[in-house]
């Protein structure tokens, strides 16, 4: 009986896994659930409101640009901001300069930023000399650093209904030229209603009511405007042998391809009919101008013109800006005010083939045409060696459009087409006001980060940067 008890005891121990067994013989431990890594860090880097700098111009300026660039030697991107002031007497004649302010945000190398205008610009109260409309980036002086050229004007809402009021919107073009520790502000050329600009090597080209071009030779600006006699007010692209111009004249609008200032090819849309139109800076004055209506992709739009272009290898990507009635149909010969319209922006694609402009039928799946914007980037944001499109849309809480709250529209290149990336879970700008944003690799880790800032410093001029943890399409 004693031996039977011992045998049963041994059997019980073996069946229960006791008696010096390894840990692998123990009862299974439930596996730990690891939450997926979020795309962006929870808390943003915040760049302080530069109110003590821009308030010398005005208290609630337009926040036109926040330009990412490298100024100091750490791994983080630095920023140059430009603010300019709206008219205090809109629609009235004014020939005073538009007040403005430049602000340089320098990284401290640890995710923080300080404003240092004195070291970067040589002045606490640095200015470009008016309202900036567009800028172009290049290396004009060949020092390996970014230089910037700005199309400038005094278009702040003042009147523009006759010759005298029109030329009161003119301003001189501006350059930010890099040097060892910062930037020198240079103004070149004649005052104009500057609207477009391109840098091509050591050459800088400006389009306005006239064309201007300059080349930096031995640290001296040389006027070469006679080589570029027809640069578009709206937008142009400069190639080695060609220029592509956005044009609207004689009831036609579209693109022209120029070689040695001669048009060799064009793609044009014919005006459907005319209406009488009161622009935003003439609101309430009763000053109407004739305006063309164009049928684009089966819809009638006011105006319609290519306003921005970029290159992706051989592909030319362009935006057509137009406007539509908020309600009803556009009637030939009718009277309309810009306040009755909503903006529309459509993408179009082109190539140069055998010296001819050819439109390419490339689809953007989920294209959002009702978000207004001026600027977009042609960059590879998901590291697949194909350039994508990032539209810096205006998020405006006062209109009827969906509010992106600072998040750009991101169109991912999938080879033969693009698709609208779902950004619904992305962080948004924290201030409940008009905002805008773009993508940039701020911390130089190879993935793109989300940069957001206001359209105007109505409530705050804070800048918010959400660093990414991974590729934006992972």
Language model features by range: what are they?
Residues 2-10:
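Sec-dependent signal peptide recognition
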Residues 14-15:
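C-terminal motif of bacterial Sec signal peptides marking the signal peptidase cleavage site
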Residues 29-62, 106-130, 172-197, 202-205, ...:
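Blade-edge motifs of beta-propeller repeat domains
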Residues 62-72, 82, 131-142, 151, ...:
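Beta-propeller blade termini
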Residues 73-83, 142-152, 202-207, 241-247, ...:
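Acidic/hydrophobic-patterned starts of short beta strands in beta-sheet-rich repeat architectures
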Residues 84-90, 154-159, 249-252, 322-327, ...:
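Short glycine/acidic-enriched loop and turn motifs that connect beta-strands
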Residues 372-378, 391-406:
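Loop/turn-rich, solvent-exposed surfaces of beta-rich toroidal or solenoidal domains
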Residues 436-474:
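Blade-level signature of beta-propeller repeat domains, shared across WD40, Kelch, NHL, RCC1
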């Amino acid at each position: 009986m004693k031996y039977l008890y011992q045998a049963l005891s041994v059997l019980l121990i073996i069946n229960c896994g006791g008696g010096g067994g390894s840990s692998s013989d123990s009862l299974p431990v439930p596996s730990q659930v690891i939450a997926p890594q979020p795309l962006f860090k929870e808390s943003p880097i915040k760049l302080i409101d530069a109110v003590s700098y821009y308030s010398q111009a005005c208290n609630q300026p337009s926040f036109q640009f926040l330009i990412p660039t490298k100024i100091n030697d750490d791994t983080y991107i630095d920023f140059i901001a430009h603010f300019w002031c709206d008219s205090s007497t809109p629609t009235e004649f004014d020939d005073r300069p538009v007040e403005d302010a430049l602000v340089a945000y320098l990284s401290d190398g640890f995710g923080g930023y300080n404003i240092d205008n004195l070291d970067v610009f040589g002045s606490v109260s640095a200015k470009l000399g008016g309202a900036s409309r567009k800028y172009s980036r290049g290396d004009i002086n060949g020092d390996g650093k970014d230089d910037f050229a700005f199309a400038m004007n005094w278009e702040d809402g003042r009147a523009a209904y006759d010759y005298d009021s029109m030329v009161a919107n003119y301003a001189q073009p501006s350059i930010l030229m890099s040097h060892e520790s910062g930037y020198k502000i240079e103004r070149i050329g004649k005052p104009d209603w500057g609207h477009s600009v391109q840098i091509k090597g050591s050459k800088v080209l400006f389009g306005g009511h006239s064309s201007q071009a300059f080349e930096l030779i031995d640290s001296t600006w040389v006027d070469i405007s006679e080589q570029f006699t027809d640069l578009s007010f709206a937008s142009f692209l400069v190639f080695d042998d060609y220029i592509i111009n956005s044009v609207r004249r004689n009831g036609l609008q579209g693109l022209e391809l120029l070689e040695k200032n001669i048009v060799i090819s064009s793609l044009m849309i014919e005006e459907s009919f005319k209406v009488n139109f009161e622009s935003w800076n003439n609101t309430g004055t009763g000053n109407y101008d004739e305006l063309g209506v164009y049928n684009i992709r089966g819809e009638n739009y006011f105006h319609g013109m290519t306003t921005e272009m970029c290159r992706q290898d051989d592909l030319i990507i362009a935006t057509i800006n137009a406007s539509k009635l908020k309600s009803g149909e556009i009637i030939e010969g009718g009277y309309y005010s810009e306040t009755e319209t909503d903006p529309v922006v459509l993408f179009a694609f082109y190539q140069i083939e055998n010296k001819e402009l050819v439109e390419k039928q490339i689809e953007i799946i989920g294209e959002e045409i009702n978000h207004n914007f001026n600027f977009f980037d042609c960059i590879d944001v998901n590291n697949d060696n194909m350039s994508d499109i990032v539209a810096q849309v205006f998020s405006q809480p006062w209109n009827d459009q969906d509010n992106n709250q600072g998040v750009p529209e991101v169109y991912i290149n999938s080879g033969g087409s693009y698709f609208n990336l779902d950004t619904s879970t992305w962080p948004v700008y924290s201030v409940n006001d008009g905002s805008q944003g773009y993508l940039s690799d701020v911390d130089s880790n190879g993935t793109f980060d989300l940069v957001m800032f206001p359209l105007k410093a109505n409530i705050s001029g804070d800048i918010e940067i959400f660093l990414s943890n991974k590729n934006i399409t992972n």
